């Protein structure tokens, strides 16, 4: 189920404050955040936000096509290393 339009997008207040400060000072350093649940706003376009994936902060450059999505969508939390090789099957 999607979020109701009358509620508006959810963004943590500290993230909005850091983004506004970065825009006014034209700071290019990544903004570190643990808030994967925050939605990408149009004010974030052009900023680099380092989203925590549970282990490290993944830098995400915000483009106009990301607006409306959650930050957590762009920092994957699971890594797939492949299935183990079957020892019974011998390659010819």
Swiss-Prot record:
Any one cellular-component term (Gene Ontology): cytoplasm
GO terms (BP aspect): ribosomal small subunit assembly; translation
Record has Ribonucleoprotein as a keyword: yes
Keywords: Ribonucleoprotein, Ribosomal protein, RNA-binding, rRNA-binding
Pfam families from the UniProt entry: Ribosomal_S19
RNA-binding as UniProt keyword: yes
Gene3D superfamilies reported in the protein's UniProt record: 30s Ribosomal Protein S19, Chain A
GO terms of molecular function: rRNA binding; structural constituent of ribosome
PROSITE patterns, alphabetized: RIBOSOMAL_S19
Function of the protein: Protein S19 forms a complex with S13 that binds strongly to the 16S ribosomal RNA.
Similarity comment text for this entry: Belongs to the universal ribosomal protein uS19 family.
Official protein name in the record: Small ribosomal subunit protein uS19
Lineage of source species: Bacteria, Pseudomonadati, Pseudomonadota, Betaproteobacteria, Burkholderiales
């Amino acid at each position: 189920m999607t979020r109701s339009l009358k509620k508006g997008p959810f963004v943590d207040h500290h993230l909005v404050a850091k983004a506004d400060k970065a825009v006014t000072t034209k700071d290019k350093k990544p903004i570190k955040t643990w808030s994967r649940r925050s939605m990408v706003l149009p004010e974030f376009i052009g900023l680099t936000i380092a989203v925590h994936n549970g282990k490290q902060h993944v830098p995400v450059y915000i483009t106009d096509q990301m607006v409306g999505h959650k930050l957590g969508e762009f920092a994957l939390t699971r890594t797939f290393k492949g299935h183990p090789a079957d020892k019974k099957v011998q390659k010819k």
